[in-house]
Design a protein with these regions (language model features):
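Flexible glycine-/small-residue-rich
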Residues: 35, 89-91, 209, 245, ...
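Residue-level detection of beta-strand scaffold positions
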Residues: 29-33, 137, 349-351
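Charged- and aromatic-enriched interaction segments used to assemble
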Residues: 84-232, 393-396
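Well-ordered beta-strand positions in beta-sheet-rich domains
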Residues: 65-70, 86, 217, 301, ...
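Acidic, small/polar-enriched beta strand-loop surface segments
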Residues: 2-6, 108, 187, 191, ...
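Assembly/oligomerization scaffold segments
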Residues: 1-105, 192-194, 224-225
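Extracytoplasmic
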Residues: 15-17, 26-30, 66, 82-84, ...
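Short, acidic/charged, Gly/Pro-enriched secondary-structure junctions
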Residues: 1-10, 40-77, 108-129, 187, ...
Length: 396
């Protein structure tokens, strides 16, 4: 097997099949694998004991960590053949989806605190770190201790500084409901700042905005993939998204607003949303966040032979296939990766989205270019200077 799996630091030596789904726009990824279960073996009895919420780590073919999580579910099977234990769970940070703020951590209201402050306090209750980052992983090119590695471009530094400023900007007053999950509360706050709530391979929570200017990792075509698909959900999209701020106690009778436009939608389709908390200046971020959310109505699927276990959510790939209406060398961001492995075949399925679906702009690239349009779709400064527009020709 290409992967190495450990439970509480001990290697699982006889797993036969499974899947790992890494997600960007989520606070947790998921895993499942099947392993031979020797019922009389004391080590197996301890390793596969249910309801212990044991720690799991998964390493790729180069023995780099790609997943840190918690075992949730056990399913045991016994028949005339092999006895198997089927183990599944989610990332370390996934617990935030399942728990509300404990009574011991009340009050539920926060005054004059940033989302970083609030997230640090709530995630810290479960031993989870919170990191401000423009990378979906910490394997390479990661923001470390608030400093950007020197090789990162100036534009990327600017993106990171903008993200850091928003993550540390103050909410006047916010409040969680007693039954609301910690994840839902943090996601609500993050959306008002146009920040993505994500996680990395260590199970840390990320306050995240992607680096839209990164170069593509791979170039995928009809010829080097097993399957491709494209779904365009026009009903979910609008040309103009207006955000109106509810009048506050301090600003009674005053309603501020901002508008963000989706340049992919030429027909006039306006909508208006209400910003229920935050500052008056948050309406622009709120509008961009709504456009970003709507852009997820464009979904690209790519199925590949083998395990692409060095690709990670948040990275860019190029896709060129006329049959899914991708006439240009279109840039898409990896939103999810599902790696399926067993004794007979390994496959990887990518879920791709428009990069601006994590920012709302400021410019949304024309992914709808066709051969009747002016040839302005190739972005040489973002792609390699060769005819294939890729920086990894080994995939071709």
């Amino acid at each position: 097997m290409a992967f190495r799996i450990t439970i509480d630091g001990k290697n699982v030596t006889h797993f036969t099949s499974g899947s790992i789904t890494l997600k960007l726009d989520s606070i947790a990824s998921t895993f499942e694998f099947s392993s031979r279960f020797a019922a009389q073996d004391k080590e197996h009895q301890e390793m596969f004991k249910p309801l212990q919420y044991k720690d799991v780590q998964i390493f790729n073919s180069k023995d780099k960590l790609i997943f840190t999580g918690t075992i949730l579910n056990h399913r045991f099977k016994s028949n005339r053949g092999r006895e198997l234990a089927i183990i599944s769970g989610y990332s370390k940070s996934g617990i935030l989806e399942d728990v509300s703020i404990p009574v011991s951590a009340y009050p539920l209201e926060s005054t004059n605190r940033s989302i970083k402050d609030i997230a640090d306090r709530l995630c810290g209750l479960f031993g989870i770190k919170v990191i401000i980052s423009d990378q979906g992983k910490s394997i390479t090119d990661t923001v470390i201790k608030g400093k950007v590695k020197s090789k990162r471009a100036a534009s990327t530094k600017s993106t990171y500084e903008d993200l850091k400023a928003k993550a540390n900007s103050i909410f006047g007053r916010t409040s969680a409901s007693p039954s609301e999950s910690i994840k839902d509360y943090l996601a609500k706050l993050a959306s008002q700042k146009n920040i993505v709530l994500s996680h990395n391979e260590k199970g840390d929570v990320l306050l995240f905005q992607p680096d839209l200017m990164q170069k593509p990792r791979y170039f995928f075509t009809k010829g080097n993939s097993l399957e491709m698909s494209a779904d365009f959900n026009g009903q979910s999209m609008h040309s103009d998204v207006n955000i109106v701020r509810q009048p506050s106690d301090e600003n009674a009778g005053v309603s501020t607003s901002d508008t963000a436009k989706n340049s992919l939608i030429a027909k006039y389709r306006p909508t208006t949303k209400i910003l229920t908390s935050g500052e008056d200046t948050d309406t622009k971020d709120g509008a961009l966040n709504e456009v970003a959310s709507e852009l997820k109505g464009v979904q690209i699927g790519v199925k590949l032979q083998g395990l692409f276990d060095e690709l990670y959510p948040g990275e860019i790939v190029n896709v060129h296939n006329h049959y899914i209406y991708s006439y240009a060398y279109n840039r898409f961001m990896v939103d999810s990766i599902t790696m399926n492995f067993d004794e007979s075949e390994d496959t990887t399925t990518l879920g791709l989205v428009v990069p601006e679906s994590f920012s709302g702009g400021p410019v949304i690239r024309n992914i709808l270019y066709n051969h009747h349009d002016v040839d302005n779709h190739m972005e040489l400064h973002l792609n390699e200077y060769n005819s294939l527009y890729t920086n990894d020709e080994s995939i071709l």
